[in-house]
């Protein structure tokens, strides 16, 4: 067996292949990791040469680091999720422990003082026993406050107690049954809040779901505050009742010790203050800690990046040498957050609209209260004065609400129109500033769809929908608060539907966002097909392919229809679930509320108000679910738009050096190039070419050899894969593209005119040109005579792409457009091929005149175009095969140029 030996070149090749594989593997791993944590990788480019822009600045990844409090720990996804789960458990233990303590304090207080409530129908004996049949000593009944009346419902579930219960109360025990019920409820409620928060984090990393998570967290904290307030208020009420009763009834206060072991009020003023202080001092830090833990959870859910300081860079690079792959990273925020940031210029209008929105929402919240008042008047007092005042209040509320709604709608719509107009301007700017290679890869119809369809979806979301979202959010929060005030038991019963709605919303939201993006993609396909057919209708008609493209367009439309059908099914299922759950909840609330009315614990007016608030809440939830659909569609559409926003052009449109006194010499050195759409197919292969000032260079050769590519490279439509192109010895990559292209006159093989007048198209090369200069340029291009024959002369509209002019007329207008620019370099891509012999001769005379002291490159298959060139360059398969004058190359009978001329002369004969 012989051992295979590798030379140095083979070793270097193997090493290079291995490094590329490792780099691809690392990039793939990074992409998967970033996608998991919500980083959009659509525009990430890992290249040794291309930099990515962060806030307008190009930064390498080695200068960036994860900007979270955990970046030094290098946590993977499993470790992050484990920490998040641990935080949720700690949060649950903290809040549950706090609420259990509150319940223990509350029910202990209630048990020690319940014998002083006048509702207890019990008698005492001298021995301290209690007899249900004995007559209690008369004691003054304290007048409770409205708050205490509301809070006493927690304990006034019975109106009489037997002796064993009183003895248990006298012993200082508390009602274990109710303590267990309420503590269990609190634990379940907080568990629900935390579980919902966790579900939202698991199902999505988007900004909107994390915002909902924050709202849920705040609701949990508000519940804590309400619970603490109830406890403090009830303790104060109990303490006041004890003091009042003991001071007015010596029989009870000075009776047997079995009534009250301590012959003093349960809490004096000092102790009450101490209890309140303890609740506040313990509760507030716990709430802050709870919020901090959730902020940490969000920190673990997103990867953010910051620029390293010199000290951090040194530390990070020393400990992470494997990170030195020179990859580029682009930082992106969630699309919703970016849309909000883009709307900052409209912030004053939005704030004014928000004020009107608050008034509009408050009037909606006030209506159920006054409707309930009217019902209560009809059911009880039958007072016309109360009826009139309540009705008048409703009329005033309606007027205020109408005016507020008018102002709100107007301002939000105005802000939305300004916002979307700026989005479209920025999007169009981003599109036209991309390099030419980008347009080779993207279809025109798809880009037009981004400008029209996707922008329209965003417009609807940021105008009407955003105002409605804020309005219904305020109504939901206000309705929940007023429901708690009206009857907290029924409110808690109603909130049982929230878990079902929340989980449905999360699952539905993910599905809608996915379908929304697919729907916009299919619309873009159909737009592309339609644009191509309409713009090339003459070709379609000449081949009688109308039905073929109708079928193709129908196929594209059918694709969007199928996705739209899935979207409709998802929307229908979600709406059905929401409606069913909401209606069942209303039926249950009506039943329980009616029982409370029959028991006398709830008034008819309060039940009416409660039902109206419930209906308002249900309608608001239903509207928000519909708005969520539109928002998720908008987010899906914004994905496409922000991909264009974030894409950094490979070739800048401006910025760079400007040469004060240019000579006009161009040199191509070892240029290799392949088009972005065909990266494996080399078009230019090590091409070397020098173009001197004032010389005419003709490029000839078989079709597909690379002649037009050379023109595109000189114009810097593309950058070479390797090698360089210099202008007066300076690489054109260092030159200002605006200045550089300003000294180049270009006439393409298929000149394109814009849908304006002939004058507009000629002045496209020089916006400041006078009418005399326009006419002079047209005369030099032999275009003035046919322009004057038109009824409107130079103001004649040429139609889309110059469709109203003949091929020769379009060519001459394009030449005039190049001439008026007074360029230093002329690029003529078969510029006279569309002219007849006489026009070509006249145009050639004009071109010969403006060629003096200019660098000229001309591509032509016609012998007459290149016969007077200083140098003829034969390009075949991306290489220069021959170079010399026309006579020199013609004398080479075996050369490509000789054969080309011979074939053309034969065809002319």
Curated annotation (Swiss-Prot):
Domain ABC transporter residue range list: 666-902
UniProt keyword Nucleotide-binding present: yes
Compartments, record wording: Membrane
Organism domain of life: Eukaryota
Keyword field contains NAD: no
Residue segments, region Disordered: 1-36, 125-147
Residues where ATP binds: 701-708
One GO term describing the cellular component: membrane
Keywords assigned by UniProt, alphabetized: ATP-binding, Membrane, Nucleotide-binding, Transmembrane, Transmembrane helix, Transport
Start-end of Low complexity biased regions: 125-134
Gene3D superfamilies the UniProt entry points to: ABC transporter type 1, transmembrane domain, P-loop containing nucleotide triphosphate hydrolases
Gene Ontology annotations of biological process type: chemotaxis; culmination involved in sorocarp development; hyperosmotic response; transmembrane transport
Family, per entry: Belongs to the ABC transporter superfamily. ABCB family.
Protein name: ABC transporter B family member 1
Record organism: Dictyostelium discoideum
């Amino acid at each position: 067996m012989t051992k295979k030996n590798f030379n140095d070149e083979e070793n270097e090749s193997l090493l290079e292949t291995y490094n590329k594989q490792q780099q691809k593997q690392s990039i793939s791993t990074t992409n998967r990791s970033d996608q998991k944590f919500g980083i959009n990788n659509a525009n990430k480019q890992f290249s040794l040469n291309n930099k990515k822009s962060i806030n307008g600045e190009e930064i390498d990844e080695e200068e960036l680091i994860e900007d979270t409090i955990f970046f030094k720990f290098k946590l993977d996804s499993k470790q992050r999720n484990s920490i998040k789960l641990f935080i949720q458990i700690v949060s649950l233990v903290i809040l549950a422990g706090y609420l259990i303590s509150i319940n223990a304090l509350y029910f202990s207080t209630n048990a020690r003082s319940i014998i002083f409530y006048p509702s207890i129908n019990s008698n005492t004996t001298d021995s301290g026993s209690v007899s249900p049949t004995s007559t209690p000593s008369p004691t003054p009944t304290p007048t409770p406050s409205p708050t205490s009346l509301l809070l006493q419902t927690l304990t006034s579930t019975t109106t009489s107690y037997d002796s064993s219960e009183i003895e248990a109360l006298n012993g200082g025990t508390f009602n274990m049954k109710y303590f267990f019920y309420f503590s269990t409820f609190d634990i379940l409620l907080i568990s629900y809040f935390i579980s919902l928060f966790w579900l939202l984090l698991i199902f999505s990393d988007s900004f909107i779901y994390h915002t909902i998570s924050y709202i849920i967290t705040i609701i949990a904290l508000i519940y804590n505050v309400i619970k603490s307030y109830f406890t403090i208020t009830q303790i104060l009420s109990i303490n006041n009742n004890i003091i009042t009763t003991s001071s007015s009834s010596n029989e009870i206060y000075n009776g047997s010790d079995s009534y009250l072991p301590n012959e003093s009020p349960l809490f004096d003023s000092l102790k009450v203050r101490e209890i309140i202080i303890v609740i506040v001092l313990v509760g507030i830090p716990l709430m802050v800690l709870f919020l901090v833990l959730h902020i940490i959870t969000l920190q673990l859910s997103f990867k953010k990046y910051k620029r390293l300081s010199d000290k951090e860079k040194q530390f990070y690079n020393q400990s992470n040498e494997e990170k030195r792959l020179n990859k580029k990273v682009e930082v992106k925020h969630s699309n919703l957050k970016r849309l909000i940031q883009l709307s900052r210029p409209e912030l004053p209008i939005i704030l004014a609209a928000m004020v009107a929105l608050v008034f509009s929402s408050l009037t909606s919240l006030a209506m159920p209260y006054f409707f309930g008042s009217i019902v209560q008047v009809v059911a009880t007092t039958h007072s016309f004065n109360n009826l009139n005042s309540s009705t008048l209040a409703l009329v005033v509320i309606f007027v205020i609400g109408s005016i507020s709604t008018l102002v709100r709608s107007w301002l939000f719509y105005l802000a939305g129109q300004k916002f979307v107009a700026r989005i479209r301007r920025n999007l169009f700017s981003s599109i036209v500033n991309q390099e030419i290679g980008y347009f080779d890869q993207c279809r025109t119809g798809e880009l037009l769809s981004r400008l029209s369809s996707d922008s329209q979806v965003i417009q609807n979301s940021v105008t009407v929908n955003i105002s409605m979202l804020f309005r219904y959010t305020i109504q939901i929060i206000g309705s929940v608060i007023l429901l708690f005030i009206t009857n907290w038991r029924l409110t808690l019963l109603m909130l049982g539907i929230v878990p079902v709605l929340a989980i449905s919303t999360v699952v539905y939201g993910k599905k809608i966002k996915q379908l929304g993006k697919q729907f916009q993609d299919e619309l873009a396909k159909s737009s592309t097909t339609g644009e191509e057919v309409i713009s090339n209708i003459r070709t379609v008609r000449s081949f009688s392919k109308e039905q073929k493209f109708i079928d193709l367009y129908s196929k594209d439309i059918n694709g969007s229809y199928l996705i739209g059908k899935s979207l409709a099914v998802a929307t229908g299922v979600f709406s059905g679930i929401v409606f069913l759950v909401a209606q069942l909840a209303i039926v249950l609330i009506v039943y329980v509320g009616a029982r409370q009315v029959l028991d006398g614990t709830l008034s008819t007016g309060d039940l009416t108000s409660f039902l109206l608030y419930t209906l308002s809440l249900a309608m608001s939830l239903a509207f928000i679910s519909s708005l969520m659909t539109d928002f998720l569609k908008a987010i899906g559409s914004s994905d496409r738009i922000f991909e264009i926003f974030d894409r950094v052009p490979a070739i800048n449109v401006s910025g760079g050096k400007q040469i004060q006194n240019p000579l006009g010499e161009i040199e191509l050195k070892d240029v290799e190039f392949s088009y972005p759409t065909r990266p494996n197919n080399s078009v230019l292969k090590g091409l070397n070419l020098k173009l001197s000032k004032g010389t005419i260079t003709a490029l000839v050769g078989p079709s597909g050899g690379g002649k037009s590519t050379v023109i595109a490279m000189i114009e810097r439509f593309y950058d070479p894969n390797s090698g360089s192109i210099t202008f007066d010895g300076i690489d054109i990559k260092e030159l200002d593209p605006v200045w550089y292209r300003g000294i180049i006159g270009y006439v393409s093989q298929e000149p394109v005119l814009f849908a304006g007048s002939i004058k507009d198209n000629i002045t496209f090369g020089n916006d400041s040109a006078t009418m005399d200069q326009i006419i002079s340029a047209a005369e030099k291009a032999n275009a003035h005579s046919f322009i004057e024959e038109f009824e409107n002369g130079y103001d004649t509209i040429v139609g889309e792409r110059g469709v109203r002019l003949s091929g020769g007329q379009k060519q001459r207008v394009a030449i005039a457009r190049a001439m008026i620019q007074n360029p230093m370099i002329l690029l003529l891509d078969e510029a006279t091929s569309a002219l007849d012999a006489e026009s070509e001769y006249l145009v050639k005379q004009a071109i010969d005149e403006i060629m003096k002291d200019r660098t000229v490159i001309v591509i032509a298959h016609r012998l007459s175009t290149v016969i007077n060139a200083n140098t003829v360059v034969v390009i075949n398969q991306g290489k220069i095969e021959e170079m010399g004058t026309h006579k020199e190359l013609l004398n080479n009978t075996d050369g490509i140029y000789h054969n080309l001329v011979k074939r053309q002369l034969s065809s002319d004969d």
